[in-house]
């Protein structure tokens, strides 16, 4: 059995991950971490998420070193500030990591990856753990590779629930980065307003829409003079992300020390390798 600690266990994603870890025959939930100010501290996580008693109490981040003694991997779906503080603690305690938090700057990622590498553990870091979204990444790569030199413009539209705190989504930014990489050029434009003039050939438009309880929609458009291609992924449940996180957890505990992406999990290799 693979021992799992869930960081952000009482959040939207954390609750789903805890439930799915409990249901998975290869995994064992050994720790549930929540904010130091959480009203659920000290309660059985199973009672909080509605699955009955589990014997696992919700604990603050200060409990990580002790909980890590019985764990193999930490799954972190929290917020930028919490991950930057707690993920290095988990790594120094010897835990491999699966990080699905978004909202990092490039410098944040450099610092985080350095801490993980210094600790000598393995980590999967991805803005979206959904298996379908990671296939969308690969299809977008092919789309840009084939059409990029044929006069097509690329635009990205993402839609999320009204509670999401960062925009555009990490997934949309990753899609834009993939297009930039394949084109060898690109300038992200975040929405348009006023007299902006004609579209520049290097632009990659990124539009964020917020409202309702949309789990997450992402559309990549390749717009040519005579035709348009759209690739769309719609998440129907947060379980799509939780399922991917569990797949990543099973991968990372067997992987050599280093930094991995979901591309590596699905297609093999290490960051920068694969398809």
UniProtKB/Swiss-Prot annotation:
Q: Which PROSITE patterns match?
A: DAPB
Q: What is its EC number?
A: 1.17.1.8
Write the lineage as a comma-separated list: Archaea, Methanobacteriati, Methanobacteriota, Methanomada group, Methanopyri
Q: Which UniProt keywords apply?
A: Amino-acid biosynthesis, Cytoplasm, Diaminopimelate biosynthesis, Lysine biosynthesis, NAD, NADP, Oxidoreductase
This one is known as 4-hydroxy-tetrahydrodipicolinate reductase
**Pfam families to which the protein is assigned, alphabetical:** DapB_C, DapB_N
Q: What class of enzyme is it?
A: oxidoreductase
GN (gene name): dapB
Q: What does this protein do?
A: Catalyzes the conversion of 4-hydroxy-tetrahydrodipicolinate (HTPA) to tetrahydrodipicolinate.
Domain of life, source organism: Archaea
Q: Name one GO molecular function term.
A: oxidoreductase activity, acting on CH or CH2 groups, NAD or NADP as acceptor
């Amino acid at each position: 059995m693979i021992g799992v600690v869930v960081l952000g266990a009482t959040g939207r994603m954390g609750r789903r991950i805890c439930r799915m870890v409990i249901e998975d025959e290869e995994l064992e939930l050994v720790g549930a971490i929540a904010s130091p100010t959480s009203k659920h501290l000290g309660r059985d996580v199973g009672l909080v998420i509605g699955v009955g008693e589990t014997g696992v109490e919700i604990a603050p981040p200060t409990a990580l070193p002790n909980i890590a003694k019985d764990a193999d991997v930490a799954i972190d779906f929290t917020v930028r500030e919490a991950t930057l503080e707690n993920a290095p603690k988990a790594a120094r305690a010897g835990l491999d990591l699966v990080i699905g938090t978004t909202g990092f700057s490039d410098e944040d990622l450099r610092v985080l990856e350095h801490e993980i590498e210094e600790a000598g553990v393995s980590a999967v870091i991805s803005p979206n753990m959904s298996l379908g979204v990671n296939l969308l990444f690969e299809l977008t790569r092919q789309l840009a590779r084939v059409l990029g030199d044929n006069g097509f413009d690329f635009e990205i539209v993402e839609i999320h629930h009204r509670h999401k705190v960062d925009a555009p989504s990490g997934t949309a930014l990753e899609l834009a980065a993939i297009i930039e990489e394949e084109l060898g050029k690109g300038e992200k434009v975040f929405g348009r307003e006023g007299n902006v003039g004609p579209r520049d050939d290097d632009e990659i438009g990124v539009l964020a829409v917020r409202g309702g309880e949309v789990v997450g929609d992402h559309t990549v458009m390749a717009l040519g003079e005579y035709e348009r291609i759209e690739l769309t992924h719609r998440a129907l449940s947060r379980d799509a992300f939780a399922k991917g996180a569990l797949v990543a957890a099973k991968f990372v505990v067997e992987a050599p020390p280093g930094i991995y992406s979901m591309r590596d999990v699905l297609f093999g290799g290490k960051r920068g390798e694969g398809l």
